[in-house]
Amino acid sequence: MSRKLSHVLLIGVGLFSSTWVMAAVKEYDLTIAEQTVNITGKPLKRITVNGKFVAPLLEFEEGDDAVIRVHNKLKNQDSSIHWHGLILPGIMDGVPGFNQFDGIAPNKTYEYKFKVRQNGTYWYHSHSKGQEQDGLYGPLVIYPKNKVPLTAGEKADRDYVVLLSDFHNSTSGQIMSNLKKEADYYQNRRETVFDVFRQIKRDGLKATWKDRSMWNQMRMLKTDMSDVTNYTFLMNGKTPEQNWTGNFKAGEKVRLRFINASAMSLFDVRIPNLKMTVVSADGQPVKPVPVDEFRIGTAETYDVIVEPKQANYQIEAESIDRSGFSIGTLHDENTSPVKSIVMPTPRPRALLTMEDMGMNHDMSSMKGMDHDMSSMKGMDHDMSSMKGMDHDMSSMKGMDHDMSSMKGMDHDMSSMKGMDHDMSSMKGMDHDMSSMKGMDHDMSSMKGMDHDMSSMKGMDHDMSSMKGMDHDMSSMKGMDHDMSSMKGMDHDMSSKTMSSSGSDEVVYGWANASTPAGLKALQYSDLQSLTPQKDTRAPEREIEIRLGGNMERYIWTINGKKFNETEPFKVKYGERIRLKFVNDSMMAHPMHLHGMFMQLENGQDPSNMPNKHTVIVPPGKTVTTLLTADELGEWAIHCHLLYHMSAGMMNKLIVANVDSNSTDSKDVVAQPNTNDKGVNQHAHH
């Protein structure tokens, strides 16, 4: 054998050995089944994975070849698993109806195979019906090769996943059915007449009436921060009473990988008396940001480093509707056993404002919304028929209400029996109503006032007759979605509280987390990519994604259409585009893109913009991202609030290899290749 040939063979063997060493095969078997679980003291049938609720942690290293066999043992239900935030071939993404993937039939097995091309904190969940809510979700962590930290600042002695989720005693199917019957079905913390009086005292009667008239005409609730309530919030599958605990020793650094795996809940996260340093967002490394708290949207992830010094710290994740907490403990294992948790006092709940609707209180700008109440058939607006509502105005001491001058108000107040609201305590409220001429105070439209309407004879509550009340606000011209202060959503969490604490107190504005003075809450504008972005091109074009809905029928839309009515977004492979999310609704939407990372336009230089797979779009606001379409396939883009997606807020983004009009599968669907050495530039650092 010649020396030259021997040299070539040695090189070949060396390359093969190197490839073999670097590309370890990591295999898992996951069995999906229905079993009885007991989370809240009531045995319930829920979905388990490998007999566990919640599903087990999956761990990989960057460069591994993942082989995951999923066995569906559910009766009469197809299933699926989506690998949330992972860059992989489209057919491995796990969304039925996309990329020629049909789901996993009962008693069948599907083998997911893909190259692990990134590192970071991610998770996995079903993309079939409401199975995610019912238990099919779990954490997924990818370590850098050989678990070497990316920076010295990320080096930690302990590493814990903190999986936040919401558990309901009703199944996902029951919840969706209830929302379809009545969108406000779970709104059990509506405002009362006393909230109205508090607003009058603060803003004055005229401003209060104007504000509430607009909300009533839209038939929306200021309290609608979350569509579904009555959740028990879990941390790593444990209730607050069960108290998940992570141990440490004095002097150690601890990495906490927060994952919001809830179906419908956003959380404000804090560890009182312990500073956190954010080092990763959505699995992607960012420059360190010291914070005291952060808001985490559904499907987002944040990694933080902490250096605990006390014996115990309580991890608190409070739902933004202030209905409960997910709680756990950090405990110094060399000290006495941790005591039972202390339930924190809820922070004041936030009420939505007209600014959250992007309207600046000018109803004339709401073109496209038909507020002609004459279409509300069956509603007798003669207030004399509203028996059971006793508003004795004579008891409102100190309030100079000359009712005779209130033209346009035909309300026989004497007949409103049964509402025992003693106004005698409202002294000092001098509201001259003579200036309120011409105001049509149709009190029958005061939705959101928690009064039993069963006694209000003559009112037909069949809302199907309310023609023209389509809450898809994409047609509401004149709505000023001011982006100047947003740049990708700046969560102004400064405290504007009416009181220091207490669940009955309120603050105003979706973004108001009641952060105590002097403490730092993470803003989207704080996030910078740890390493410079490789693609800083300006976008070639913009795709507008308007988020709206019709609350009377509980329908959620993108650009005015439900998923089954939409045309896919089509993008050329390699194209640089801007995605413009415009929220025309009164609720926040965490918008998630499969298959690729977006760069959030948050005021940072293009080279420093952070990568995100999910962005919160607050009510009435606009958020923009940049995207390099460098992954072939059909990719879901949707709201990650489960019931919003199920009700229609979803579309398909097709990245094609040829012209943008092609949908030929051979040009779109990238087949799996476990030897793929390509690296997505937005996922690898």
Task: Give the positions of each predicted feature.
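Bacterial N-terminal signal peptides that target proteins for export
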Residues: 1-9
